[in-house]
Amino acid sequence: MSQDTPSNEPPANRIVGVPAETFPDERRVALAPANVAVLQKAGVNVIIQSGAGTPAGYADDEYAAAGAKLIDDRDQIFKQAEIILQVRTAGANPDNGSDDDGLLREGQTLVGMCDPFLGAGVMQGLAARGVTSFALELLPRITRAQSMDVLSSQASIAGYKAVLA
């Protein structure tokens, strides 16, 4: 392949980081151990904060077995990772999300539910610092993007939980 031809392969040593969720009573985690293996196979390294999966029922050893590196220090997740995955981040976490704002740096990418309308000031601040944000709740609800539709999938799960509770 020539140097002018774009590659679909991720750059070598790309690191995805998953810090523990800080939104009150949030039990979800942004990445399950099964997905760690998929990312590893694609050449992406995964680091996860120790205990991040516990509220969702995933033990640290499951992440380690899938190939993730466990890190105790939350700040180190933000220092080492190019891409940060969180369930509720930025404006979607008004009480604690600002704690992470100072940890994000220029060139970093933040993926999660960001609530960019209610948290517009937070989002503008991140953009001004050169942080790229993907607000998953704004993905179009079309057939082609259905596998990434976080609103429908999470609403369905919440509905089942309400019936069973």
Predicted features by range, described:
Residues E82, R88-T89, C114-D115:
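Short glycine-/small-residue-rich Rossmann-like dinucleotide-binding loops
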Residues S2-I15, E21, A92, N96-A165:
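Glycine/serine-rich phosphate-binding loop and adjoining beta1-alpha1 elements at the start
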Residues Q3-D4, E9-S50:
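N-terminal phosphate-binding or glycine-rich loops at protein starts, especially the Walker A/P-loop
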Residues V44, A68, V131:
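Short phosphate-binding/catalytic loops that engage adenosine nucleotides
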Residues A81-E82, Q108:
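Conserved acidic residues
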